[in-house]
Amino acid sequence: MNLVRTGQFKKDYKRIKKQGEDLEDLRSVIKMLVEGKPLPPEYRDHTLSGRLKKHRECHIAPDWLLIYRIKGDDLILERTGSHSELFR
């Protein structure tokens, strides 16, 4: 699977890094997704609804989310951050 990072994801990633989050957790989840492996239940991976119905969300930590979608052979990383940062 090809990994695609949106411009917004890149901004979110820089912000998360600046906040001192452990990026290894995020990298681990991304690696599983790229390899096509199902995420373990503790990540609470699920489909979103409404305008984001083509997207999925998983929890890196209790209040740290990754929003992504799969289109063909592409894993598109859309956003990462807390609930309040992503759903204003």
PLM-predicted stretches and their roles:
Residues 1-62, 70-76, 85-88:
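Basic, Lys/Arg-enriched alpha-helical interface segments
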Residues 82:
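Active-site glycine-centered loops adjacent to acidic/histidine catalytic or metal-binding residues
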